[in-house]
């Protein structure tokens, strides 16, 4: 029996200001579906003991047989903010991680207000990690970094607490380096466009006379990076 009755979800649907669409993005096998199961368990839809085993949102038979997500699927969840008791309806979208189903990831990102970006702490930034981060960037979806499978650092690599801390710091820096690349690419494209426009305006008023010096405006990029201090 779900903790949140359907009538409560129906009531929340009438308050569109408190509805959020959130997609789960990651490289294949980094734990998207297990996380989705765990979030479903908070609403009593499945038992917490079955999280990661039942793969609830992998509703297709071939998904269950192959053990991978092939199609984006969603479900509505109830969330109550502890600070002010505000109630939200979260439309959670679990998306594929395999490169063959990247169109499903794009569709999920376009529908979303935010994204949970999962990274396996041992495997780190993989090909599809970069791809899903870029998809979130292109769609202007606000991402939250989720470092997953932390137990592997202790069980498999036998890390000490200080080693695990350093490893996670380095992993966050790797992800931020990817975001820095996106920022730089967009910045160069914007600067090139602005320079072309400035040259055109100069020709209109000065003809073929040499153009005076033109300076680029500095922009702060600190807001794009993941940082535990910022809560993202």
Predicted features by range, described:
Residues 1-119, 157, 166, 173-177:
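P-loop NTPase switch module centered on the Walker A-proximal segment
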Residues 26, 37, 119, 145-149, ...:
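Glycine-rich, histidine-containing beta strand-loop boundary motifs that form or position
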Residues 30, 42-45, 98-99, 122-125, ...:
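Conserved nucleotide-binding/hydrolysis micro-motifs of P-loop NTPases
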Residues 109, 114-220:
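Conserved C-terminal guanine-recognition region of P-loop GTPase G domains, centered on the G4
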Residues 215-217, 222, 226-232:
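Long, low-complexity, serine/threonine- and charged-residue-rich intrinsically disordered N-terminal tails
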């Amino acid at each position: 029996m779900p903790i949140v009755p359907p009538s409560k979800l129906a009531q929340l649907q009438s308050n569109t200001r408190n509805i959020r669409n959130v997609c789960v993005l990651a490289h294949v096998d980094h734990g998207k579906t297990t996380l989705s199961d765990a979030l479903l368990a908070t609403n009593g839809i499945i038992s917490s003991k079955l999280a990661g085993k039942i793969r609830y949102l992998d509703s297709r038979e071939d998904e269950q047989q192959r053990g991978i997500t092939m199609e984006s699927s969603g479900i509505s969840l109830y969330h109550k903010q502890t600070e002010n008791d505000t109630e939200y309806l979260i439309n959670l979208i679990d998306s594929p991680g395999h490169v063959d189903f990247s169109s499903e990831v794009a569709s999920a990102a376009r529908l979303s207000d935010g994204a949970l970006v999962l990274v396996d702490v041992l495997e780190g930034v993989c090909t599809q990690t970069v791809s899903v981060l870029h998809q979130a960037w292109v769609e202007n979806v606000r991402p939250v970094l989720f470092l997953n499978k932390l137990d592997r650092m202790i069980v498999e690599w036998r890390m000490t607490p200080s080693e695990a801390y350093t490893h996670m710091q380095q992993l966050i820096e790797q992800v931020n380096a990817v975001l820095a690349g996106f920022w730089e690419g967009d910045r160069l494209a914007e600067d090139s466009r602005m320079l072309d426009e400035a040259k055109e305006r100069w020709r209109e008023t000065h003809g073929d006379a040499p153009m005076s010096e033109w300076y680029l405006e500095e922009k702060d990029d600190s807001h794009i990076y993941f940082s535990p201090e910022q809560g993202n």
